[in-house]
Curated annotation (Swiss-Prot):
This protein's name: SUMO-activating enzyme subunit aos-1
GO CC terms in record: cytoplasm; SUMO activating enzyme complex
Description of how the protein assembles with itself and partners: Heterodimer of aos-1 and uba-2.
UniProt entry tagged with the keyword Zinc: no
InterPro entries linked: ThiF/MoeB/HesA, ThiF_NAD_FAD-bd, Ubiquitin-activating_enz
Organism of provenance: Caenorhabditis elegans
Pathway info: Protein modification; protein sumoylation
Highest taxon, organism lineage: Eukaryota
Pfam families: ThiF (PF00899)
Membrane spanning stretches: none
Amino acid sequence: MEVSKAEQAIYDRQIRLWGMEAQNKIRNSKVLIIGGKQLGAEVAKTLSLAGVDEMHLVDHRLVDTEEIGMNFLYDASVDNSKMTKWAASYNFLYNLNRNVKLFIVEEDVLSKNDSEIEEYLTKFTLVVVLDESYERTAKVNNICRKHHIRFISGAIYGWIGYAFFDFDGHAYLVKAKSPDCLNEEESETGKTSTVVTVDEEFVLETFSYPSFVETLNSDFTAKKIVRKCKRIVPTSYFLVKSMLRASSENKLTGVTENDIEKLIPIWNEEVAAGNHTIDMQPVQPDRFDHLFGPNFGPTAACVGGVIGQEAIKSISEGKNPLRNLFIYTGFESTGFMCNFPPV
């Protein structure tokens, strides 16, 4: 299915940016987004504007009252509290781009047995898992790797957030320099004069990506890694990893004071494992309350923007995707791109 003339008029600017071939690939893509909170809203908006063929939006949870003023997809003039998160977002997304087919799934798809989950995931071009537990994210990632499906995950923890990318085995454009013209002239002295004109070209290259589990359990003990840990491992990584671990180990109760107490020893362990020192961490435990919400809007916007960018790049097989863990911290208004496990 190719982009119609009517769609060409709608997508004219982005077609000028990445070309008709890329837009056709986007037009034929089917995307699954699991998780309809702030981060999901940012990603869904970007992919809707890009013009994917289908977006399947999964979330069985009802809208929380505190979310209504934080999620721009919700209509604050109506009572959203009795609706599931994506159902409350439907009208905004439908009117944003009516060429995109929207499918709202109001059930907990990841609670099904493994064979049912696997069968469900195989029909998608890209799977995006947001604000989910470590175990569920890892399970979906393993299935996607098995079936060669592009995978992205991410989460927001108050003022910090992360995005993980796994495009293992997919090909993308990378820069390649080749001589366009070679002209050699012999001078009277016998020396060779060489004139070379180099044009910048792009070639397809297949990329290898580590899994979610491999990335989030990076080993920093190798001697050559220890020496450069303070340079390649951002301090915000330890906050993200600690939150993932606390959730995985069922340490979080929903009571912020208690959760901070449970988080501190985990954070201490992660900082030590990353060859950093506690006293050099810019975010100390007295600020850990910022990790438990409400989520910081600019953090969701930054992480969601990067996810949307890489999703489009991945689907369209564009230029050189990021590899492989992006972390944003609202404490310092800084984003870090990590290539983990480090080599």
